[in-house]
């Protein structure tokens, strides 16, 4: 019989922070909903996890992680196991009755969440498919976030394994009510649609206190149009020019208008700054350190405009109701444009057609890595954002995403309904 209170989450880190970011967020959301859950996170890159949650010790193969009033077990994917035993003495769990067997580690081989088609570590694969292992296990594959139609079709679709007692099913994040929706954490619940930016005064104040206290970012309170920039390594010329032209255009009617761009730590920071210097530093930039996940969530809600990349920050941006631009992960044959256009199709009905034209034009140009990005649509989109013309479209889209429900809650409801 399934022990539905014990959940193992598997994460093989491919994108430095994207994969573990979603997994950490999912674990937080599950614990927030049900603090009594026993979670075990199996992660292949503890260094990346440490950047996101400083409590993680990258040198420990097995460790406890304290989140609010709960304790998770964190396990290194790369454990070396022979015949069901850890190879080195230092990797044993320190328990009174430890006999070196993996089964004594209390690994919850009941509900297993495989995230992003990550597969399973060798030691877990051997245990699951050992001839003597007959207990029923439900594997739930949490797939990549996409707006493509196949997400609707694959959600809750059963899949086979090589053993009848090992069940598997697809669980699809997405942007429609036919999918599992998005992970909604506390910060999104604080302020969805409560103000033009979708952020309550409480959330805004909490962010200012939390981020400035831990990171020294005291410039947040300055009156300026605040842009957050987080991207993959790219040329950045069109982005810098588009922002500079936007500021110049706004100053035609307001000489005091200014832009501050907050540069996230990462590979995009240096090329952005290089192009910014070539244009004689036309606006202010502030380099921000790598933020803990909770700080990041609050921080972006204080912005006026967002550049985000990958999966996790896309979901955060979409839920805020703020104007944003998404950069998809580059794929062979420019396939990322398929994903970008799929999301564009989901969004466009929430906007007046004329207002959506520059949004669509820049999203497509920005994600077309085979052609030069055009700056003009970005300038127009920023002008519409500063004048609150496109705000309703982004807010209405965010409302719909909230109405679709919380992926973590849908997941727990699905697990509750299992009768294996």
What is each model feature region?
Residues 9-12, 115, 172-192, 220-258, ...:
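Active-site donor-nucleotide binding/catalytic segment of nucleotide-sugar enzymes
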Residues 281-291:
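Active-site donor-binding acidic/aromatic loop of nucleotide-activated sugar
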Residues 11-33, 40-84, 94-101, 106-165:
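Active-site and donor-binding regions of nucleotide-sugar-utilizing enzymes
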Residues 38-46, 260-266:
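Short internal beta-strands
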Residues 193, 349-420:
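C-terminal amphipathic helix plus adjacent low-complexity
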Residues 143-211, 222-237:
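A nucleotide-sugar donor-handling region in carbohydrate enzymes
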Residues 81-109, 192-222, 253, 274-282:
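Intrinsic disorder/low-complexity segments
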């Amino acid at each position: 019989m399934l022990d539905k209170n014990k959940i193992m989450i598997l994460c093989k880190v491919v994108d430095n922070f994207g994969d573990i970011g979603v997994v950490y967020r999912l674990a937080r959301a599950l614990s927030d909903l049900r603090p009594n859950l026993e979670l075990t996170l199996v992660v292949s890159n503890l260094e990346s996890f440490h950047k996101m949650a400083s409590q993680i010790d990258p040198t420990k193969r097995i460790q406890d992680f304290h989140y609010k009033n709960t304790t998770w077990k964190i396990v290194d994917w790369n454990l070396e196991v022979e015949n069901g035993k850890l190879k080195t003495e230092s990797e044993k769990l320190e328990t009174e009755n430890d006999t070196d067997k993996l089964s004594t580690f209390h690994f919850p081989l009941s509900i297993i969440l495989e995230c992003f088609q990550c597969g399973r570590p060798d030691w877990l694969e051997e245990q699951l498919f050992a001839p003597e292992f007959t207990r029923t296990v439900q594997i739930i594959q949490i797939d990549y976030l996409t707006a493509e139609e196949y997400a609707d079709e694959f959600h809750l679709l059963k899949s086979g394994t090589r053993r009848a007692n090992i069940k598997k099913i697809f669980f699809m994040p997405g942007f429609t009510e036919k999918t599992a929706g998005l992970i909604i954490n506390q910060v999104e619940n604080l302020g969805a649609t409560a103000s033009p930016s979708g952020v309550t005064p409480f959330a805004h104040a909490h962010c200012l206190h939390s981020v400035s206290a831990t990171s020294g970012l005291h410039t947040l309170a300055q009156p300026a149009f605040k842009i957050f920039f987080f991207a993959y390594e790219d040329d950045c010329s069109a982005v810098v020019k588009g922002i500079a032209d936007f500021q110049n255009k706004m100053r035609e009617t307001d000489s005091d208008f200014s832009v501050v761009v907050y540069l996230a730590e990462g590979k995009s920071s240096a090329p952005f700054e290089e192009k910014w210097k070539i244009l004689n530093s036309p606006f202010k930039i502030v380099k921000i350190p790598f933020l803990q996940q909770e700080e990041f969530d609050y921080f972006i809600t204080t912005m006026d405009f967002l550049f985000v990349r990958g999966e996790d920050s896309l979901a955060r941006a979409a839920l805020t109701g703020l104007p944003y631009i998404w950069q998809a992960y580059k794929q062979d044959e420019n396939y990322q444009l398929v994903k970008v256009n799929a999301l564009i199709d989901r969004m466009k009905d929430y906007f007046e057609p004329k207002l959506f034209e520059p949004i669509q034009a820049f999203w497509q140009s920005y994600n077309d890595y085979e052609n030069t990005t055009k700056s003009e649509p970005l300038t127009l989109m920023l002008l519409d954002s500063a004048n609150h013309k496109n705000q309703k479209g982004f807010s209405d889209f965010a409302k719909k995403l909230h109405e679709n429900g919380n992926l973590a809650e849908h997941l727990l409801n699905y697990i509750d309904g299992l009768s294996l």
